[in-house]
Amino acid sequence: MARLKEIYRKEIAPKLKEELKLSNVMEVPRVTKITLNMGLGEAIGDKKVIEHAVADLEKITGQKVVVTYARKSIAGFKVREGWPIGVKVTLRRDRMYEFLDRLLSISLPRVRDFRGLNAKSFDGRGNYSMGVKEQIIFPEIDYDKIDALRGLDITLTTTAKNDDEGRALLRAFKFPFRN
Protein backbone atom coordinates (compact mmCIF):
# COMPACT_ATOMS: atom_id res chain seq x y z
CA MET A 1 0.00 0.00 0.00
CA ALA A 2 1.22 3.51 -0.80
CA ARG A 3 2.71 5.39 2.16
CA LEU A 4 0.40 8.40 1.80
CA LYS A 5 -2.69 6.17 1.51
CA GLU A 6 -1.80 4.51 4.80
CA ILE A 7 -1.26 7.89 6.47
CA TYR A 8 -4.65 9.02 5.11
CA ARG A 9 -6.46 5.97 6.50
CA LYS A 10 -4.78 5.91 9.92
CA GLU A 11 -4.21 9.60 10.72
CA ILE A 12 -5.84 12.07 8.33
CA ALA A 13 -9.34 10.53 7.99
CA PRO A 14 -10.01 10.24 11.77
CA LYS A 15 -8.61 13.76 12.36
CA LEU A 16 -10.75 15.29 9.58
CA LYS A 17 -13.84 13.43 10.85
CA GLU A 18 -13.41 15.21 14.20
CA GLU A 19 -12.45 18.56 12.68
CA LEU A 20 -15.35 18.70 10.20
CA LYS A 21 -17.80 17.18 12.74
CA LEU A 22 -18.83 14.32 10.46
CA SER A 23 -20.80 11.32 11.76
CA ASN A 24 -19.36 8.64 9.46
CA VAL A 25 -15.77 8.04 8.29
CA MET A 26 -17.09 7.56 4.72
CA GLU A 27 -18.18 11.23 4.68
CA VAL A 28 -14.58 12.37 5.12
CA PRO A 29 -13.31 14.03 1.91
CA ARG A 30 -10.67 12.11 -0.03
CA VAL A 31 -8.67 12.57 -3.22
CA THR A 32 -10.31 10.53 -6.00
CA LYS A 33 -8.01 11.28 -8.96
CA ILE A 34 -5.12 13.44 -10.13
CA THR A 35 -5.12 14.64 -13.72
CA LEU A 36 -1.94 15.91 -15.38
CA ASN A 37 -2.36 17.90 -18.58
CA MET A 38 0.24 19.38 -20.92
CA GLY A 39 -1.14 21.83 -23.50
CA LEU A 40 1.22 21.94 -26.46
CA GLY A 41 0.47 24.86 -28.74
CA GLU A 42 3.93 24.54 -30.30
CA ALA A 43 3.03 21.01 -31.50
CA ILE A 44 1.24 22.53 -34.51
CA GLY A 45 4.49 23.05 -36.40
CA ASP A 46 6.46 20.08 -35.05
CA LYS A 47 5.10 16.56 -34.45
CA LYS A 48 8.19 15.57 -32.42
CA VAL A 49 7.00 17.89 -29.62
CA ILE A 50 4.08 15.51 -28.91
CA GLU A 51 6.42 12.49 -28.81
CA HIS A 52 8.75 14.19 -26.31
CA ALA A 53 5.82 15.34 -24.15
CA VAL A 54 4.35 11.81 -24.12
CA ALA A 55 7.73 10.37 -23.09
CA ASP A 56 8.16 12.98 -20.32
CA LEU A 57 4.68 12.49 -18.88
CA GLU A 58 5.02 8.69 -19.01
CA LYS A 59 8.31 8.93 -17.08
CA ILE A 60 6.72 11.22 -14.47
CA THR A 61 3.58 9.13 -13.93
CA GLY A 62 4.60 5.60 -14.90
CA GLN A 63 1.37 5.26 -16.85
CA LYS A 64 0.26 5.41 -20.51
CA VAL A 65 -0.54 8.92 -21.71
CA VAL A 66 -3.48 9.98 -23.92
CA VAL A 67 -2.89 12.46 -26.76
CA THR A 68 -5.64 15.11 -26.96
CA TYR A 69 -6.83 16.44 -30.30
CA ALA A 70 -8.39 19.76 -31.36
CA ARG A 71 -12.20 19.52 -31.39
CA LYS A 72 -12.63 22.25 -33.98
CA SER A 73 -10.53 24.40 -36.30
CA ILE A 74 -9.49 27.86 -35.07
CA ALA A 75 -7.91 30.04 -37.76
CA GLY A 76 -6.51 32.54 -35.25
CA PHE A 77 -4.42 29.82 -33.61
CA LYS A 78 -3.68 28.07 -36.94
CA VAL A 79 -5.24 24.87 -35.58
CA ARG A 80 -7.22 22.33 -37.61
CA GLU A 81 -9.81 19.92 -36.25
CA GLY A 82 -8.22 16.59 -35.34
CA TRP A 83 -4.67 17.87 -34.91
CA PRO A 84 -2.82 16.74 -31.75
CA ILE A 85 -2.56 19.71 -29.34
CA GLY A 86 -1.81 18.19 -25.94
CA VAL A 87 -1.30 15.16 -23.71
CA LYS A 88 -2.99 14.12 -20.50
CA VAL A 89 -3.00 11.31 -17.96
CA THR A 90 -5.35 10.46 -15.08
CA LEU A 91 -3.96 8.79 -11.96
CA ARG A 92 -6.13 6.87 -9.50
CA ARG A 93 -5.68 4.60 -6.46
CA ASP A 94 -2.11 3.63 -5.48
CA ARG A 95 -0.40 5.37 -8.42
CA MET A 96 -2.22 8.56 -7.46
CA TYR A 97 -1.02 8.39 -3.85
CA GLU A 98 2.54 7.57 -4.92
CA PHE A 99 2.57 10.53 -7.33
CA LEU A 100 1.14 12.83 -4.64
CA ASP A 101 3.85 11.65 -2.22
CA ARG A 102 6.61 12.37 -4.77
CA LEU A 103 5.05 15.74 -5.64
CA LEU A 104 4.93 16.91 -2.02
CA SER A 105 8.21 15.48 -0.74
CA ILE A 106 10.54 15.76 -3.76
CA SER A 107 9.17 17.84 -6.65
CA LEU A 108 7.69 20.96 -4.99
CA PRO A 109 10.84 21.59 -2.91
CA ARG A 110 12.83 21.56 -6.19
CA VAL A 111 10.83 24.47 -7.66
CA ARG A 112 12.95 27.60 -8.00
CA ASP A 113 11.86 30.54 -5.77
CA PHE A 114 9.07 28.43 -4.26
CA ARG A 115 7.02 30.40 -1.75
CA GLY A 116 4.11 28.01 -1.38
CA LEU A 117 1.00 27.07 -3.34
CA ASN A 118 -1.86 29.51 -3.91
CA ALA A 119 -4.65 28.65 -1.46
CA LYS A 120 -7.23 30.31 -3.74
CA SER A 121 -6.88 27.82 -6.62
CA PHE A 122 -9.96 25.82 -5.60
CA ASP A 123 -12.89 25.58 -8.02
CA GLY A 124 -15.81 26.00 -5.59
CA ARG A 125 -16.41 22.26 -5.25
CA GLY A 126 -13.28 21.31 -3.32
CA ASN A 127 -11.07 20.44 -6.31
CA TYR A 128 -7.60 22.00 -6.50
CA SER A 129 -5.64 22.98 -9.63
CA MET A 130 -2.04 24.08 -9.88
CA GLY A 131 0.46 24.73 -12.61
CA VAL A 132 4.10 23.67 -12.85
CA LYS A 133 6.31 25.84 -15.06
CA GLU A 134 9.04 23.26 -15.72
CA GLN A 135 8.87 19.48 -15.95
CA ILE A 136 12.45 19.18 -14.63
CA ILE A 137 11.27 19.48 -11.00
CA PHE A 138 10.34 15.79 -11.21
CA PRO A 139 13.28 13.47 -10.41
CA GLU A 140 12.33 11.08 -13.24
CA ILE A 141 13.20 13.69 -15.88
CA ASP A 142 16.89 13.90 -16.81
CA TYR A 143 17.82 17.55 -17.43
CA ASP A 144 20.36 16.66 -20.14
CA LYS A 145 17.89 14.62 -22.19
CA ILE A 146 15.00 17.10 -22.51
CA ASP A 147 14.45 19.07 -25.71
CA ALA A 148 12.51 22.01 -24.18
CA LEU A 149 11.16 23.17 -20.83
CA ARG A 150 7.42 22.56 -20.70
CA GLY A 151 4.90 23.27 -18.01
CA LEU A 152 1.94 21.17 -16.99
CA ASP A 153 -1.34 21.51 -15.13
CA ILE A 154 -2.10 19.28 -12.15
CA THR A 155 -5.70 18.92 -10.96
CA LEU A 156 -6.62 17.10 -7.76
CA THR A 157 -10.25 15.96 -7.76
CA THR A 158 -11.68 15.35 -4.29
CA THR A 159 -14.98 14.22 -2.79
CA ALA A 160 -15.13 17.43 -0.73
CA LYS A 161 -18.45 19.28 -0.92
CA ASN A 162 -16.90 22.77 -0.82
CA ASP A 163 -13.57 24.61 -0.85
CA ASP A 164 -13.22 24.65 2.94
CA GLU A 165 -13.42 20.86 3.16
CA GLY A 166 -11.01 20.51 0.23
CA ARG A 167 -8.58 22.96 1.84
CA ALA A 168 -8.78 21.06 5.16
CA LEU A 169 -8.04 17.79 3.33
CA LEU A 170 -5.00 19.17 1.48
CA ARG A 171 -3.70 20.89 4.63
CA ALA A 172 -3.91 17.50 6.37
CA PHE A 173 -1.77 16.09 3.54
CA LYS A 174 0.72 18.89 4.42
CA PHE A 175 0.31 20.90 1.20
CA PRO A 176 2.58 23.97 1.47
CA PHE A 177 -0.03 26.74 1.04
CA ARG A 178 1.16 30.35 1.06
CA ASN A 179 -1.31 31.73 3.60
Swiss-Prot record:
GO terms for cellular component: ribonucleoprotein complex; ribosome. Gene3D superfamilies: 3.30.1440.10. Keywords: Ribonucleoprotein, Ribosomal protein, RNA-binding, rRNA-binding, tRNA-binding. This is one of the proteins that bind and probably mediate the attachment of the 5S RNA into the large ribosomal subunit, where it forms part of the central protuberance. In the 70S ribosome it contacts protein S13 of the 30S subunit (bridge B1b), connecting the 2 subunits; this bridge is implicated in subunit movement. Contacts the P site tRNA; the 5S rRNA and some of its associated proteins might help stabilize positioning of ribosome-bound tRNAs. Part of the 50S ribosomal subunit; part of the 5S rRNA/L5/L18/L25 subcomplex. Contacts the 5S rRNA and the P site tRNA. Forms a bridge to the 30S subunit in the 70S ribosome. PANTHER family: 60S RIBOSOMAL PROTEIN L11-RELATED (PTHR11994). Belongs to the universal ribosomal protein uL5 family. This is Large ribosomal subunit protein uL5. It comes from Pseudomonas savastanoi pv. phaseolicola (strain 1448A / Race 6) (Pseudomonas syringae pv. phaseolicola (strain 1448A / Race 6)). The gene is rplE.
